[in-house]
Amino acid sequence: MSAKIIDGARIAADLRADIAKDVEKIKAKGVQPTLAVILVGNDPASQSYVKGKTNALHEVGMNDRTFRLPETTTQDELLKLIKELNADKLINGILVQLPLPKQIDPDAVIEAINPEKDVDGFHPVNVGKLLLGHDTFIPCTPHGVIHLLKRTGVETKGAKVVIVGRSNIVGKPLSVLMMNKDVNATVTVCHSGTKNLTEVTKEADILVAAMGKPRFIKADMIKKGAVVIDVGVNRIDDSTKKSGFRLVGDVDFEPACEIASAITPVPKGVGPMTIAMLVANTLIAAKRQNGLE
């Protein structure tokens, strides 16, 4: 069996095209959607992610205000900037690129963002609303996974979903979304304390790999015909590349393609969907703040 490759880049491009039409409509009413992006330090991966996000914003007609702060920035300095952006009515969303330098507590930073501008969906208020099924900003990567499944026609009702990874950014919120009535899957979340992991993953109709370990999920951990969603983005050394590295996922891709019925690649799988959902959340924020919903 050769798995269908789920083209996240194409689906994300279609979504951005739809968003661009909505942006034109609200710009005609005098609203310019704007996202504040804060990058602390010079981490190359973070710089690359920020570039991808700002490029997507510009593509759909949104503005960004990017703040590049030195590695030595203190927590108080960052919180002061966030307070100013919270009060700025021309800023619809605030994104602080993670990870942050060790002297800054990421939880304190996330909690400082106005929940109405929390387009990442990480603020405790928005996490609570998500858990209760209330309307809120949905974390971008989990939302992107759900959108991919729906757009590719994957049947989720009654499906056994196994998520490997329990992070606050992906695993936990995705488990909630999978249980929602519009998805209606039966969910198992695996982690470092899970016993007999392969026995669990081989039960999955839909297997989501989100633990941040390169090629951790092997072909013998996948049920024949399962749909595999690879959330991982890992840099591994590759002397043949100009950059000196290449990106791989949490799934051992080529062997998995012989077992799965469909699979997301890395790159051009879940990653573009994450950015598209960030852009979508920024549009929602701009509409809400200007009474245009």
UniProtKB/Swiss-Prot annotation:
EC number(s) reported in the record: 1.5.1.5, 3.5.4.9
Biological process annotations from GO: L-histidine biosynthetic process; methionine biosynthetic process; purine nucleotide biosynthetic process; tetrahydrofolate interconversion
Molecular function GO labels: methenyltetrahydrofolate cyclohydrolase activity; methylenetetrahydrofolate dehydrogenase (NADP+) activity
Gene3D superfamilies found in the cross-reference section: Leucine Dehydrogenase, chain A, domain 1 (3.40.50.10860), NAD(P)-binding Rossmann-like Domain (3.40.50.720)
UniProt KW rRNA-binding keyword: no
Listed pathway(s): One-carbon metabolism; tetrahydrofolate interconversion
InterPro entries for this protein: Aminoacid_DH-like_N_sf (IPR046346), NAD(P)-bd_dom_sf (IPR036291), THF_DH/CycHdrlase (IPR000672), THF_DH/CycHdrlase_cat_dom (IPR020630), THF_DH/CycHdrlase_CS (IPR020867), THF_DH/CycHdrlase_NAD-bd_dom (IPR020631)
Keywords, alphabetical: Amino-acid biosynthesis, Histidine biosynthesis, Hydrolase, Methionine biosynthesis, Multifunctional enzyme, NADP, One-carbon metabolism, Oxidoreductase, Purine biosynthesis
Reactions listed under catalytic activity: (6R)-5,10-methylene-5,6,7,8-tetrahydrofolate + NADP(+) = (6R)-5,10-methenyltetrahydrofolate + NADPH; (6R)-5,10-methenyltetrahydrofolate + H2O = (6R)-10-formyltetrahydrofolate + H(+)
Sequence positions that bind NADP(+): 165-167, 192, 233
Cellular component aspect of the GO annotation: cytosol
Domain of life: Bacteria
Protein family according to the UniProt entry: Belongs to the tetrahydrofolate dehydrogenase/cyclohydrolase family.
NCBIfam families cross-referenced by the UniProt entry: PRK14186.1
HAMAP family per UniProt: THF_DHG_CYH
Assembly description: Homodimer.
Function: Catalyzes the oxidation of 5,10-methylenetetrahydrofolate to 5,10-methenyltetrahydrofolate and then the hydrolysis of 5,10-methenyltetrahydrofolate to 10-formyltetrahydrofolate.
Listed name of the protein: Bifunctional protein FolD
Organism (species): Treponema denticola (strain ATCC 35405 / DSM 14222 / CIP 103919 / JCM 8153 / KCTC 15104)
